Structures are given as structure tokens and as C-alpha cells.
Amino acid sequence: MAVSMASQFFSQEEGTSEVVSTSERVVELLNMAALATNDTKITMLKQVQELIINKDPTLLDNFLDEIIAFQADKSVEVRKIVVNFIEEACKLDNELLIKLIANLHMLLKDENVNVVKKSILTMTQLYKVALQWVARSRPPSEQQESCWDLVTEMAADILLLLESDNDGMRTHAVKFVESLIVTLSPRTADSEVPKRQDGDISLEQIPPDHQFLKYNTLRDLGKQAVKELLKFMAHPAISSINLTAALGSLASIARQRPMFMAEVIQAYETLHANLPPTLAKSQVSSVRKNLKLQLLSVLRHPSSYEYQGPISTLLLDLGTSQGEITRHLPPPRDSNRKRAREDGEGGQKKSRTDIPLPDDDDDKDTMQLPTIPAPAPSTQSATDITADFVRPLLSPENVANLVLISMVYLPDSMPASFQSTYTPVESAGTDSQIRHLARLMATQMSAAGIGPGVEQSKDIPVDVVEEENIKPEGLVIKRRISALTKGQAISVLGCQSEKTKEEEEEEDDAPLAKKRPEPILPATQIRPSGVGGRKKVFRLKEVTEPLTDVQIKSLKLGAVRRILQAERSVGSSGASQMRVKVLARLVTQLDISVKAEVLSHFLNDPRMRLDLALAWLYQEYCEYQSGAGEEGYQECLIGILTGLQERPDQRDGVFTKVVLEAPLLTDSALDVLRKYCEDEGRSYLGMSTLRDLILTRPARQFQYLHLLLDLSSHEKDKIRQQSLHFIKRMYEKESLRPYIEKFALNYLQLLVHPNPPSVLFGADKDTEVAAPWTEDTVKQCLYLYLALLPQNHKLIHELASVYTEATADIKRTVLRVIETPIRGMGMNSPELLLLVENCPKGAETLVTRCLHILTDKVPPSPELVKRVRELYHKRLPDVRFLIPVLNGLDKKEVIQALPKLIKLNPIVVKEVFNRLLGTQHGEVSSSLSPLTPGDLLVALHNIDSSKCDMKSVIKATNLCFSARSVYTSEVLAVVLQQLMDTTPLPMLLMRTVIQALGMYPRLGGFIMNILTRLIYKQVWKYPKVWEGFIKCCQRTKPQSFSVLLQLPPPQLLSVLQTSPDLRDPLLAHVRAFTPHQLAHVPHSIMAILEAESRTDAGAEEAAQVEEEQETPAQDIIARRLAQEKSLKKQIEEQKGRNNQEMEEVAEVDPPAIFIAEEEEEESLKSQGKEEPQEDSSSNATTAEKSPVADEPMEEEPVEKKD
């Protein structure tokens, strides 16, 4: 539509104002973006792109350099925006490719993965744009040719990224390769063309007479890309993400370029037969599902008609139903229509393109236009040959034999991975299934390098292989050297003819014809200049003089110092790693002074310069491995470790990091590590390092473990305890346990030597020295063993074995130090119980000590008591074994063992009584003892004198009385009561009575009752007891006077003869009686008391006469009744006057002279006359049956009056 000049003029005026405002806005945004932060900068640059690309493209040339300058920005997102701007700008104006393709090449080499991925996506679009632009240029310029060379080089770089370490980069590279293959292959009638790619260029659109775009070269590039993609998908370690992307790309290629459908189907078959072993179970399921979807999409394509058999078989193996396969088959009519259209278009194309092409100066071959390839490849592959070989062999008999043979190697249960992917074969035995099985087997055989197909491929003549290999190499455009480093380069096109020497010389002399595209660089950078003409070669030797050794050394040292001092400036520029590498390489090649300078530099700040030390150390190790001596590495390692050890503050673990990162630890380095561990302030860090070495370096772990074990016998307690702590944790590991046990037992066995070996004093050899064993040296041999004992109870038997052969001094030390480990084992340890049961000869004291330790604070277990009892009764009848388990024995067993126990050492006897009385820890708790305190004291009195001497029994009773908190007055009262009931009377009865009275004087009344009962038991018949009776009467006078008056005359006379000092007080006591009371005192008693002036013989005769004289029973009873009434009256008066406090003792019987009235009446009726002795015995019987009085016996009235 024509526009008038006036309307054009006015529209230009309106546009000018708009451009000015847009331009100012762009300038403003660019200035603000240069100073803004990342987020704001990104927003502004997006606005700039919107204004320039979409609103006013005329501003593109004006602000191109300013926008491209942001490609050096530190922000990744900013650089990605620059990549996107390059794409949009080049699509808008293809001529900008000449300016911007070099910048895109730089961004393709960016250090950030995301920028590289964005650049690959941009290249996916710009490759087609560049090819279309170059193909339509008639004639193309040299700049376009150079630009296309760089685009081709970038495509080759992206192909190499298929081997990248980054999953995302590989995925983006797969997508680029897919686009590259579609672009560099002809579009046919059956090709699917996505709507968004409808206008894209393809190979058939390349002009046949183009100056440098060669049809065959581009076609071979596309085929080579197909091979690279297939090779990538067949890699055994391909990831699930990459495999999914490759499957989709191959399916897309097969639909858009049916000529490659055969290769795609074969690749799918190979993948189905050889899934990568690195995939997880869930990934395998995902890949199989994706493979099924891609096969269905390929099956829907009209060109899949020739491949429906293998595709259907694969789908059936993947679990697809036959109905679903049928639904995805292309309609026959569509297929026929497309074939007709293909034939028509093919004829037209043939008529249009079958024009002879003019000769090209660069390539003398005649170009042939593309024809639609046959569906199957013209030559058979190794897989096809092997499949043809295997297929006839798959007869039912052979298959059955193979199944039977393979069943031997099958697992008992179906593996989960196989079960999850297995699908039943629906068409088993059919011809298609046999062909499919043959191809699967052939694929696996070819991958393994076996089969006739592989053999035939090896037998191909060498000239054919060379010819096939030479052709693509000549056609592939060679890689260029980067323009940033070389300036200019000549584009080399495919050519098979070799150049002569003359032609090469001419090319060398010729100036460079084409200039490679250069990137737009920021103003602050210096643009590299191109190579000019020839220059005179500069020879350094012509202008320099040799330096002296001193100068050389000084220059070297100065250079290294400058590098060291430039640490901060180099770090700010981001070249720290390069600086470290340079220093590491330099220092290994220079002399000691330089090494000392670098070491000093490191030690000034070890934490920040650790990377330098490790780089230097590894460089020295590389030199050592390459054949140099070990001295350099040794000096470097020792220098670093020693320097770190000498530093006062080492809390950041640099020493540990160096030790753990060092590639090799020499013996000298281990010596430094040992000294580090022996420093009390660093012992934990040093031993932690040793532990990490043991766990992370299995090749020499026992050497490091030996060092840690050596420290377990260190003389410093802190070092030793720290070492034992780590060893016990190492002991939990099964692989280290035998070595640790062996070391501990070796040290334990040293105790059998007559003298301590020198190994205990730090010497290298195990030789004995003249020094005797001391407690410290004995403990050195035991520390590790005792630390392991609670963790491995079986080691206790080794201690018993060594103990039997050791000297007395060693045994004493062993007994002192085993308390903690034995307590840690516990009395329920099976090994400890076994030791008790099988106590070795000579280890009795060790076993006894163990028993004492185990039962010191807790009662013995029934199992322990059982083992000790069996040991005592069957093998070793040593009563000392029973002491620790006394509280677990029966009462009868303890009483039987008492005679032997009290004959032991006094200290041991005291321990026995402490256990029985429950007072071993200063607390009274006899609830667990089989004997009560009273039972124990009674048992001691009843010990047979033939089994134990009386002296030991007396000492034992004294121990009981020393436990005053146990033997209270109540307990003693019960004991005395039990002893009184014993027949015959115990020999030590009166001694106990006297001791009880001495401990508790308030028992006086109860004692009087005891004495009275003893008269009834005719105590004078027991000489020892009678002697004690007299002594007790002496000590308890005047309370005992009433008891003495109850004695028969002969026994009273014996008492007065034994203790004459009792006569006068007793006589005075009697004379103080009232006449009524005195009338009841027998004349014989008075005669004995008043016979002081007579001779002893006369007194005896009078006593005998009085005894023989028969007195009527009535007179005796009357006198005693009177005495009873008189005494009772006196007692009541005494209670009223003194109000004496009642004593809490056992009830006592009344004196024998007090007879109840009922007994008096019975005696009057039944008896005539009785002898005094018989009367005493009858009263004694009565007293025994009477209960113990609650009140103590009162003192005599005469004493109270006084």
C-alpha cells in the first residue's frame, strides 16, 4: 500500500520523539544497572532488552556494546541475561552474528554451569539461524565464512560436553545434538514437522553451489552426530536423567527424519537388552516406562511400517497389550497417501535437482543431491550377523537344554529388581519372538565382544577400514584455535588431497586471508591484537650476560618472597589457587633456603595457609613417586609437623589435618606424632588423630595402632588414661580386637620374667635389665590388660596363669590393682564363676581377693555361693574361701565353719565378724546375715574345745562385745538367757556375764537373777563356771549378798575361803536383819559367817554337822516365809524412799529363798524332811520355769539404809 510523502513525514516526526524518549530511558536504565545490586540490575537489564528488542529495534546498534559489557559481571543471572540478549538480537538482525558469536563462544566457556547451559540452549537456536543466514547470502562474505567456522567449532565443543561431569550440561547437549541432526539431514515427505519448527532450515535447502557450505560435509556431520548420540546412550554408566533425554531425542529424530529409524530401533533393542547396571530399581521402572512411550510414538509414524515387527516385540516385552499396540498402528490409507505424496514429491525434486552442478574450485568432486534412503541399512552390522547366526540355533531342544543348564546358577528366590521389571512373554515360540530373542542375544554378545559378527568385523581388510576412516576426517571441519589467544586463524575446509611441500611453503609465506570474529570486550580490557607480518626473532642470549650463583640464588629467593607477599592482592583477584600451584612447583625445584622461607610463611598463619602446605607436600610426594629420593618429602613433612608442634597454640586442628591429608607417613613423622601425643595439653587431639589414621588407612593401621598401644603404659597418668580411653573404643571393632588382645597379653606375660624387660624403659629390644620389679613397672604391664578385662571376661584366666608363676611382690601389686576391673565384671560373669570353680593351684589368694571385691558391698549371688561351696567341699577345703560368701551360706554351715574361722589372723577374724554382723562399712545391717548377733555369740560359747582353743574363742567373744552398737543390753539379755538354757553350761558363761555387766551396769538385777538360777543348776559342779560365779559375786556386792545366802553351807564356805574379803560385809549384812529376819537364817550359815576366829577345819566340821542334822520341813518353811515377808517389806520401803528407775531387762525369777504359799502348802502335805541340797535343786527348777521379771533386782535393805 503506497503512503504519501506527507504522511511519511509526519509519522517520522512522531517516531523521532518516541525514539528519543526510549533512548533516554535505555541510557538511564543502563547507568542505573551499572551501579545497582544483583536483583535490581537483573530487572533493569530485562527492561532494557524489552525496550530495544521489542519496542525500538533501531537502538540495537547504539547500545549493543554497553549491554554486552555486562557479560563480565560476577552475577550468574546477569550473564544469563546477556546470553538471552545475544540470542534475541541475532534472531532480530542476523548480521549481528558477526559481532556477537565470539562473545557467545566466551560465555560457552564460562566457569558457571548455569551460564554454560543457557549458552547451549542459545546455540540450539542460533545454529539454525546462522546456517540459514549463510545459505541465503549470495555471495557470502569472508566475515560470514569466519563466523560459520566459529559456529561449527562451538557445535563441536557442545558435542564434547556429552562427556561432561554435570548431568544438566549433558542433558542440554543431548537436546542440541537432536537439533543438529534434524538440521543437518534432509526433510522427506514422511517427516514430522513441529509447528514451532516449520520455518527451520534443513539440509535439502542448502544451495548446491554454495561457496563453503558443502552438502556432503554437512550430511556427514549429521551422521557423526547420530553416532555420538547412540554411543552416549549406550554408555553403561549413563544416568537416569540423561537416558530419558536421549530416548526422547532419538524418538523425535526418528519421527522427523525417518531415514534414521533403523538406527533408533536398533538402539532401543540394545538398551532393552542391556540396561545400565547403575540404575536403581525405581529408575529401571521409569526408564522402561519411558521406552514404552517412545516406542509407541515411533510406531504411530507412517514410516514405521517396515519395523512394526521388532517394535511390537519390544512393546510386548515391556508389558504392552496387543490391543494397545494395534491402536497405535498408523492407518493404512494415511500410509498409502503419504507414499503417493512421497513419490510425487520425489519425482518433482528429482526433476528439479538433477541439473549438473558447476565444478567447485575447492572440491573437485561432483555433488549428488540427497535421495530418500532405504529403510534398512545397506550393510549388515555385527549385531545383524550374529543374530542371523543365532536364530537357526534356537530350536526347542537347544532352548530347553540352555534353560536346564542355567537353572543351576539361578538364585533360590527371584531378585526384587528382576521381579519388578519382568513381564510374561505372550508370543513365546512364534517366529517373531524367536527373531527378537536372537537379536537380544546378538546384542549382548556383540557388547561382550564375541560372536561371528564381531569376528567378521575384525577380518575387514585394512585398506577398506582406512578408506572409511579417512573420508569422514577429511570432511569434518577441523577445530580452530581460540581467537582470544591466537588472534587470527584460517578456516580449513574438507579436502582429501594431500598438499605438496611447495604448497605448504606457499601457504606459510602467504598472509592470513581471513580474520576470525573477535568478541566485544569491555572498555577496561585490552583487546588482543591480530598477528601482523613477520617480525625479527628476539634472541635472549644476545642481550644478556650470565649471572653468578649468588645472584641466581638471590633472584630466586626474591621472586618467591614476592609471590608470598602478594597473598592478599592475588586473593582479591581470584587467583589464589594458581598462586598456590606455582609456589608448590617452585619450592620443590629450588634449594633449602627457599623451602625454609615457604615453611616460615606457612607457620605464620597455618590455618589460612594450609592449602599451600598440602599442595607443597603433595608436590614433593609426586617427585618422590617419579623416582626422586624420599629426602625432599621427608624434610617437607617433618618440617611442617615439627613447626606445628612447636607452636604454643594449636586448637584449630591444623596438625591433625596435615597428618590425615599426608599421602605417606614416614617413621620420623610417626615419632613427631608420638611426641605430640605425649604432650599433656595436646594428648587428646594427638590421639584423636591416631584414631582417625587407624580407621581411615587400613594398609598401615596396625602400625598406628601399635603406637597408640605403646602409650597405654606411659609413665604420665593423663597420657595413659587418654590412650586407654581410645583403645577401649578401638577394642569394640572386630578387626582390631585380636591385635589389641595380643599386645595386652604380651605385656602381661612379662610379669613372669625375673626382671623387668627393657621395653618398659623405652628400649627397642625386649631384653631384661638388672633393675628389680617395682610396683610402677608391674602396673605398666597391667594397665592395658586391666582396661580390657571388663570388656572381655575370658582374659581373667590369663591373669590367673601368670599369677601362679609371679613373685610375691608382683602378686601383692596384682591384688591391689584388680579391684576396679573385677568390680566391673560383676559376680554374674560366667568366666569369673568358671575361675572360681576351677581355681588353679597357686591362685587361691587371687580368687579369694576377687571374691572379697565382689561381695564387699553387695550380697553374694546364689550362683557364686554355689561355686564357692563346691570348691570348698570338693577341691580346696580352705575356710578363707567361705569368708566372702558367709552371708550366702546356711546358718548351719556358718556355725560349722566358726571354729576354723576364729583361728585365722585377727584381722581376718574381724572381717568375718563384720560380714556376719553387717558392720563392715560402719553401718549396722545384719538383715542379710544367716546368723543374728545373738546366734553368733551363743555359737561361740558352744564351740567344742577340742576343735578350737579357748584363747581364740575368748578373742572372738571380745570382738562381739566391741560391736557395742550391735550387742545392746537387750541382745545380751537374750544371749544370757539362751546360755542359761544350755546343758552343760558353757565354760565362758560367767566371763560373758561379767562383760555384759561391765558394759551395761543397769543389767545388775538381771544378773542377780542369773546367779540365782545358776545356784539352782548347781553351778559348783562346773569348776570354771563356779570360779566365774565367785568373781561375779565379788564384783556385784552388796547386791550379790542375797544370792550368797542362798548357797548351801559347803558352797558358801568355799566362796568365803576363795574370797575372804566377802565374809565381813556379808556378816554385817546379815546382822543388819531384824530379829524376825534373822530368825530365818539357818544356823549353819550363821556358823560359817561367825566362824572367823575358828580354824577352817572346825568351821568345816560344823558345816558338815549342820548339813547332816535333819531339820523338820515345817521349820524350814516357816523360817523362809518369814524371810520372804521381811525382805518384801524392805523392798517396798526402798522403792518408796528412793523411787529408783525401772530397768528394761528380762524378767528375773525371785530368789530361791522366796517360796510361794501354794508350794509351801504342797510341801507340807507331801514331804516330811528334805535335805538342803534337794531344796536348792527344786527351787532351781521352779526358777527356770518362771518368766523373766520386768524390773531389776533391788539392792539389799542394809545397803539402802546406809
From Swiss-Prot:
Disulfide bonds: none annotated. It is found in: Nucleus; Cytoplasm. Its main location: nucleus. SUPFAM superfamilies: ARM repeat. Gene3D superfamilies: Leucine-rich Repeat Variant. Residues 334-353, 1130-1140 have a biased composition (Basic and acidic residues). Belongs to the Symplekin family. Involved in histone mRNA 3'-end processing. Involved in the cytoplasmic polyadenylation element (CPE)-mediated polyadenylation of maternal mRNAs in maturing oocytes. Serves as a scaffold upon which cytoplasmic polyadenylation regulatory factors are assembled. The HEAT repeats have been determined based on 3D-structure analysis of the D.melanogaster ortholog and are not detected by sequence-based prediction programs. PANTHER family: SYMPLEKIN (PTHR15245:SF20), SYMPLEKIN-RELATED (PTHR15245). This is Symplekin.
